[in-house]
Curated annotation (Swiss-Prot):
Catalysed reactions, as listed in the record: alpha-D-glucosamine 1-phosphate = D-glucosamine 6-phosphate
GO molecular function: magnesium ion binding; phosphoglucosamine mutase activity; phosphomannomutase activity
SUPFAM superfamilies cross-referenced by the UniProt entry: Phosphoglucomutase, C-terminal domain, Phosphoglucomutase, first 3 domains
A GO BP annotation: peptidoglycan biosynthetic process
Identification of the protein by name: Phosphoglucosamine mutase
Modified residues (Phosphoserine): S102
Known role: Catalyzes the conversion of glucosamine-6-phosphate to glucosamine-1-phosphate.
Cofactor: Mg(2+)
Post-translational modification: Activated by phosphorylation.
Catalytic residues of the enzyme: S102 (phosphoserine intermediate)
Class of the enzyme per the UniProt entry, highest EC level: isomerase
Coiled coil: none
C-alpha cells in the first residue's frame, strides 16, 4: 500500500494555522472526502467537535468543502468522539467527522473520520481521499450543492444511549463521585448521564472557554481529580480527555486507576457473570502486571501495536470484545464500535455497585509492575531511534532486564515525540535504565 501523505494513525492532526490544519487545507479535505463519500450512498455526514476555539473555523471550512462536493452536513456542536460514531450509525449517515486533537493542548486540532458503521475509515477509503487531495478542487453545479443544518437533539440521544449500557437492575443512588471533563466535549454529557442514573456528582473541568481544554485537568492530568476526590470524600473519581474517548479513574484514597486496570476490572466482571467472549487485547505499552493477572484468571491476552486503531484490528481478528490502552482508550465491542470513555466508566461503576466492593478493592487482583514512560520532543526529519547510540543503549538495558522486564521505544504517530518505556520488577533500576536510554535519545536528537 502507498504511504500516507496526510493521514496519521488518528486522522489528520497538527498545530492550528500550520499545514495541514489551515482553513484552506481543511476545506479541500472536506471536498476530497465528499467526492469519495458521494459515490457510496446517502451523501450525508455527521460532524462533531470538541471545545477548542479553532473548532469554529475548521467547522466552517469543512462545511464549505463538503458543500462543494454535494454533501449534506449535520452539525452536533461540541460532542464526544464516540457520540459522533454512534450518531453516524443511528442517522444512517455515510460518514462521521470529528474536529478534535483529543488529549492534545488547545493550539492543536485535527480531523478524523468514521465509516457509516461507526468505525475508523478503511485504509482504501483514506487512500482514495488522499488521491483526491492531490487534484484541483472543483464544485458541483449550484442545484447540487450540499446544505448544512444543526442536529439539535444530539446530546439527548447520546445520553440515553450511554444510560442504556448500564444494567437496569442497578442504580447509582448513594454513590458520590467526582467527574472531570477536561473542559472538553463531555462537559454537558457525562454529568447528566451519571446524575440521571442517581449519583451525587461533583464536577471539575466542566467550564470550557476555548483554550483550557486538557489544561491541568482530565485523563492526562488527574492531580486536580485526586485532590477533589479526597476533599469531597467521594467514592471515586472519573476523568475524561478532551474528546471523551479516554478514561482514567481515581479511587477513594486518591490512587490513579489506568486503562489497563479498567480493562482488567471489566474483563473479570464479565468472566464472573459468564459473559466474557474470548480474551483481552492490550498494546505494547500494556503493563506486564495486567498480562499476569489475566493469565491467573485463565483469560487469554494478546498485544497489538500502540493506538486504538490497532487494538481494534486485533479484536476483530480474534473476534474478542474487550481491548484497552493504559492511556485510557477502552473498547467494548459488545456495546460500542469505538473507544467510549463514558460507557467504559459505566461498566466499572456497575462492577463497583454490583459487587459492593470499592474501586480500590476491585484493583487488588492486579499488581502493576514499576513502569517509567518518558517523552522526548525532537525536531527535523531524522529519527533518533535509528542511531547506533540509541540502539546500543536499548540493547544494554534489555540485557540487564532479561526476562523480568521490557523496553519499548517508539516514535509517536501524532506528535514529534520519541516515547521511551522501561518496565521491570525493581522501581529504582527501572528509573535508572530509563534515564540511560533517555540520555542517548536526547544526545541523538
Amino acid at each position: 500500500m502507498a504511504e500516507r501523505k496526510y493521514f496519521g494513525t488518528d486522522g489528520v492532526r497538527g498545530l492550528v494555522g500550520q499545514s495541514p490544519i489551515t482553513p484552506e487545507f481543511v476545506m479541500k479535505l472536506g471536498w476530497a472526502a465528499g467526492k469519495v463519500l458521494a459515490k457510496q450512498g446517502t451523501k450525508k455526514v455527521i460532524i462533531g467537535k470538541d471545545t477548542r476555539i479553532s473548532g469554529y473555523m475548521l467547522e466552517s471550512a469543512l462545511e464549505a468543502g463538503l458543500a462543494a462536493a454535494g454533501l449534506k452536513a449535520k452539525f452536533t456542536g461540541p460532542m464526544p468522539t464516540p457520540a459522533v460514531a454512534y450518531l453516524t450509525q443511528t442517522f444512517r449517515a455515510e460518514a462521521g467527522i470529528v474536529i478534535s486533537a483529543s488529549h492534545n493542548p488547545y493550539y492543536d486540532n485535527g480531523i478524523k473520520f468514521f465509516s457509516s458503521e461507526g468505525t475508523k475509515l478503511p485504509d482504501d477509503v483514506e487512500m482514495a481521499i488522499e488521491a483526491e487531495l492531490d487534484k484541483p478542487m472543483t464544485c458541483v453545479e449550484s442545484a447540487l450543492l450540499g446544505k448544512a443544518s444543526r442536529l439539535n437533539d444530539a446530546a439527548g440521544r447520546y445520553i440515553e444511549f450511554c444510560k442504556s449500557t448500564f444494567p437496569k437492575e442497578l442504580s447509582l443512588a448513594g454513590v458520590k463521585m467526582v467527574v472531570d471533563c477536561a473542559h472538553g466535549a463531555t462537559y454537558h454529557i457525562a454529568p447528566n448521564v451519571f446524575k440521571e442514573l442517581g449519583a451525587e456528582i461533583i464536577t471539575i473541568g466542566c467550564e470550557p472557554n476555548g483554550t483550557n481544554i486538557n489544561h491541568e485537568v482530565g485523563a492526562t492530568d488527574v492531580r486536580a481529580l485526586q485532590a477533589k476526590v479526597l476533599e469531597e470524600k467521594a467514592d471515586f473519581g472519573v476523568a475524561f480527555d478532551g474528546d471523551g474517548d479516554r478514561i482514567i479513574m481515581v479511587d477513594d484514597l486518591g490512587n490513579k486507576v489506568d486503562g489497563d486496570q479498567i480493562a482488567y476490572i471489566i474483563a473479570r466482571d464479565a468472566l464472573r457473570r459468564g459473559e466474557l467472549k474470548g480474551g483481552v487485547v492490550g498494546t505494547l505499552m500494556t503493563n506486564m502486571g495486567m498480562e499476569v493477572a489475566l493469565r491467573n484468571l485463565g483469560i487469554p491476552f494478546v498485544r497489538s501495536n500502540v493506538g486504538d486503531r490497532y487494538v481494534m484490528e486485533k479484536l476483530l481478528e480474534n473476534n474478542w470484545k474487550i481491548g484497552a490502552e493504559n492511556s485510557g482508550h477502552v473498547i467494548l465491542l459488545d456495546k460500542v464500535t469505538t473507544g467510549d470513555a463514558i460507557v467504559a466508566a459505566l461498566q466499572v461503576i456497575a462492577s463497583i455497585v454490583g459487587s459492593k466492593m470499592s474501586l480500590k478493592e476491585l484493583c487488588n487482583g492486579m499488581t502493576l509492575f514499576p513502569q517509567v514512560l518518558e517523552n522526548i520532543r525532537f525536531v527535523g526529519d531524522n529519527n533518533p531511534l535509528d542511531t547506533e547510540l540509541v540502539k546500543a543503549a536499548q540493547a544494554d538495558v534489555e540485557t540487564k532486564l532479561g526476562d523480568n522486564g521490557r523496553v519499548l521505544l517508539r516514535k509517536s504517530g501524532t506528535e514529534p515525540l520519541i516515547r521511551v518505556m522501561v518496565e521491570g520488577e525493581n522501581a529504582e533500576l527501572v528509573q535508572q535504565y530509563a534515564l540511560q536510554i533517555v540520555d542517548a535519545v536526547k544526545e541523538s536528537c
